[in-house]
Amino acid sequence: YHAARFEQLYQGEGSGHPIDDLQSLIRNELPFETYMELAEWYESVGCTEEALSLLSCAGNYPIALYKQAYLLHQAGNDDESRGMLQRAGALSPAMVFPFRPSSLKALEWAKTVQPDWKIDYYEALIRWANQDKAKALELLENCGEADYAPFYLSRASLKEGESRLADLLKAEQIEMSWRTGFALINHYVANNQWQKAVETGKKYTKKYPSNYYIGLKYAKALCETGQYQPCISLLSRMQVLPNEGSYAGRAVYREANLYRAMEQLSHKNYKQVVKSVETSKEWPENLGVGKPYDNMIDNRLEDYLEAKAAAGQGDSRKTSALLAAVADYTISRSHFESGNLLSALALRESGHVP
């Protein structure tokens, strides 16, 4: 237990290098958070020296430096406190994600001594992490201009409409990271601005060709703008990492092929309809999701379209068989599905109902 080891070392038991001995066994991904957690307890019981000793182990973690500055100020050591504030203010906010409400007092004090947009940003992240989104947005709005793209991405997440878009575009001006591109595409998709989504997707897919988060959104935008073959081609080159619930790639793949089949059906190109329908039934391995058991797949739309193509080709036997498959699909769910309408149409077209 790190707290027990710290007590032993702080009391003089060990090798004579207490800080080195303590740090030697703290090997987690975010060691500074361990020191922050321990220091918080010592501060809460009035053991300022112990808290400062632990915070010093956190290195150049800005929140730890602000905490040290605050505790030094409380102890009357204002010269060293100002030095800590200057160190903290000079550091980048990259990968700094504070969440402890106990850090708020130090940050609020720091703003009165050395105002800096980063302090408001850190405080906003803490407020946000503790479900006070309104206060978080208020703090972010008061920050003024910042030269840090994630600041604008964060603020955009708390906004809506044109105000949100303005922050996303500002983030893009500062840094065209994949996260900026992903946020922009998501904004356009959410607002049904499909052509903008296509333009943004094309730009960022070119810059980040192996990023399937962007690629899937771009593919969806291509599908929604009627560019079915480019969508299918893009999906064929994509490698989606398999993960639980990763159905998006296969869903767009199916949609693009079925929309293409419907387009060809309107032109009476029946052979291509059948080809597109058969392709839509595939479960490409590169799209990150495995094929379920056959009895778990609802192919009514595929079969219905293929029945229409067979009817156009004059193949009455195949038409009847496909319509029967649609009509006989076992409906086990209590709620109505759009596929149920196809079953009803198939029954009527088969002559089973008037």
Residue ranges and their predicted role:
Residues E29-L30, G59, I63, P93, ...:
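Short coil turns that delineate tetratricopeptide repeat
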Residues E7-Q8, W41, L71, I126, ...:
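Residue-level signature for tetratricopeptide repeat
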Residues G12-E13, V45, A75, N130, ...:
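Structural motif corresponding to the intra-repeat A-B loop/turn of tetratricopeptide repeats
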